[in-house]
Every structure is written in C-alpha cells, then in structure tokens.
Amino acid sequence: MPKYEIMLVVDGSIEESKATAVANDLKSILKKSTDLKLEKMGLKDLAYPINKKSRGYYYLFNFYNEDPASIQEFRRVTLLKKEVLRHLIINLEKDYGYKAKTNPKKIVRSQFRAERYKRIKEQVLAEQEKIRKERDNTPVKLTDV
C-alpha cells in the first residue's frame, strides 16, 4: 500500500479556525485512507509572496492509500479552494532516494564510486605530501631571504 505525504499551505490572513476547517474538509476527502495523521505546523512566513500573501498556515498529512482516485479528488478540490495557497503531494515509495537505497544495482554503483573517490583522494594527498617534502628539502639561499 503506497504511503503518501501532503504538505498544505492555507492563507494566513484568515482566522485560524477557518484554516483548520479547510484542512479538516480536505481530510474528509481522504476518508478511505488508513493511518491518516494531520499535523498542524502553525502560522509561518512564506519564503516568497504567493497571491500577494506573505503568511500561511502549514498542515502535513501522512497516510497510506490504495485508491488513486481519492488523491486526484484531493488535488482537484485544493485547486478549487481559494483559501489553499499551495499543496504538494508526495508518494514516499516512489521517492528516488528510497529506490536508490533499496535497488541492488544502484547500491553497487554507489560503492564503486565511493571506492574510486577514496583512491583518487589518497593519490592527491600523496602528491601533495611529496611536493611538501621536496619544498622542505631545498636549500635556502641567503639572497632569497
């Protein structure tokens, strides 16, 4: 069963109770989901203005869902609601970092790259040490001082 995470930003100029009501309305769309958690992250400043708004209420949904139609419905409703400034829906099991950690072919490739990086780093350090020793062994002329 795919695990999803949704970040929701609701307009910060409305009252907190209305923002919570918007989040709860959207939560009701996901009623077929299991292990549904709604975390309120509070009122925060936005990194840049969105629709001339500089603050927003952040909400985080975590849940498991088998029905992709409910995800599409959630997306459709958030686009229609004027109070919702932004939303981001992430399927955590399709996350490429997760796949890279579990795919054996990618694990072997990353180990090879790490070993190659280590060898190159050792060679560079050896060359730098050799140059430093040569510099220390050269005689100093009195005219150089």
UniProtKB/Swiss-Prot annotation:
* Xref: PROSITE patterns: RIBOSOMAL_S6
GO BP term, example = translation
- A GO CC term attached to the entry: cytoplasm
Keyword rRNA-binding among record annotations: yes
Instruction: Extract the GO molecular function terms from the UniProt entry.
Output: small ribosomal subunit rRNA binding; structural constituent of ribosome
Question: Which Gene3D superfamilies does the protein's record reference?
Answer: 3.30.70.60
> Keyword set for this entry?
Ribonucleoprotein, Ribosomal protein, RNA-binding, rRNA-binding
Report the Pfam families cross-referenced here.
Ribosomal_S6
Determine if rRNA-binding is one of this entry's keywords.
yes
Read off the PANTHER family from this record.
Answer: MITOCHONDRIAL 28S RIBOSOMAL PROTEIN S6, SMALL RIBOSOMAL SUBUNIT PROTEIN BS6M
Protein function: Binds together with bS18 to 16S ribosomal RNA.
The similarity annotation says: Belongs to the bacterial ribosomal protein bS6 family.
HAMAP family listed in its UniProt record: Ribosomal_bS6
Q: What is this protein called?
A: Small ribosomal subunit protein bS6
Q: Tell me which species this is from.
A: Malacoplasma penetrans (strain HF-2)
